[in-house]
């Protein structure tokens, strides 16, 4: 800015026309896909648990395999729960299938990504970049090669990796929701017996929940 030389920084990419791949087309995955489409990014998704025909209602292309999505997507955004099936779903074998210009985004659960393999993929130039809001271990081990390289701004990783402390939601509106919604949930349960957004309903039922 001091030199007023717009040619000094490296060129950045254009998002329009790049393929946005969503793994896990639930509520958050769908909301993310809609935002990507607003930037004229073609969207495709992989989710074996979404009913057939849902892609027609959403207007997004569906892939029948994870490999197909990884082969084609310029951006891969993760939106699955952490289960035995999804743990380390992004690993050395899946990262090598991704395009060299691709970017991996994980705002879901840290255990979905093998960060040892991600370190190797970034350092080896197999993918262009990654952005993580979640990690398998939180807070992370500062001695882990990927975390250390990020913390010391090593040249090979500079500008290619973003890390936030499980706080991608952090905004004034997000903080207001964080305070209001739990209270609304408790009030609804105590006054109406309705249990919303519960991840352990089966366990509560075992102990006499009214849900």
Set out the residue ranges of the language-model regions.
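Glycine-rich Rossmann-fold phosphate-binding loop(s) that bind the pyrophosphate
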Residues: 25-26
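Residues at the starts of beta-strands that form the adenosine-phosphate
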Residues: 41-42
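Rossmann-like dinucleotide-binding domain for NAD(H)/NADP(H)
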Residues: 101, 109-211
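Short, flexible hinge/linker loops that cap or flank conserved catalytic cores
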Residues: 12-16, 37, 96-97, 155
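Phosphate-binding beta-alpha-beta segment of Rossmann-like dinucleotide-binding domains, i.e.
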Residues: 1-19, 34
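Rossmann-like adenosine-cofactor binding region
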Residues: 48-151
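Gly/Ala-rich phosphate-binding loop of Rossmann-like dinucleotide-binding domains
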Residues: 33, 37, 122-123
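N-terminal Rossmann-fold NAD(P) dinucleotide-binding loop
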Residues: 29-30
């Amino acid at each position: 800015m001091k030199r007023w030389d717009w040619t000094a920084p490296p060129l950045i990419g254009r998002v329009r026309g790049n393929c946005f791949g969503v793994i896990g087309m639930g509520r958050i995955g769908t909301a993310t896909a809609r935002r990507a489409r607003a930037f004229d990014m073609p969207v495709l998704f992989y989710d074996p648990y979404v009913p057939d025909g849902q892609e027609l209602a959403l207007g997004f292309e569906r892939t029948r395999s994870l490999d197909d999505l990884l082969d084609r997507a310029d951006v891969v955004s993760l939106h699955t729960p952490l289960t035995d099936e999804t743990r380390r779903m992004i690993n050395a074998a899946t990262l090598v299938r991704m395009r060299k210009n691709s970017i991996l985004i994980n705002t879901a659960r840290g255990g979905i990504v093998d960060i040892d393999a991600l370190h190797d993929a970034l350092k080896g130039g197999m993918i262009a970049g990654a952005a993580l809001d979640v990690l398998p271990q939180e807070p992370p081990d500062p001695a882990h090669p990927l975390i250390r390289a990020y913390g010391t701004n090593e040249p090979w990783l500079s500008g290619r990796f973003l890390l936030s402390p499980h706080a991608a939601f952090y905004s004034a509106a997000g903080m207001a929701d964080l305070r209001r919604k739990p209270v609304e949930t408790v009030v609804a349960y105590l006054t109406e017996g309705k249990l919303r957004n519960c991840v352990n309903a089966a366990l509560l039922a075992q102990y006499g929940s009214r849900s």
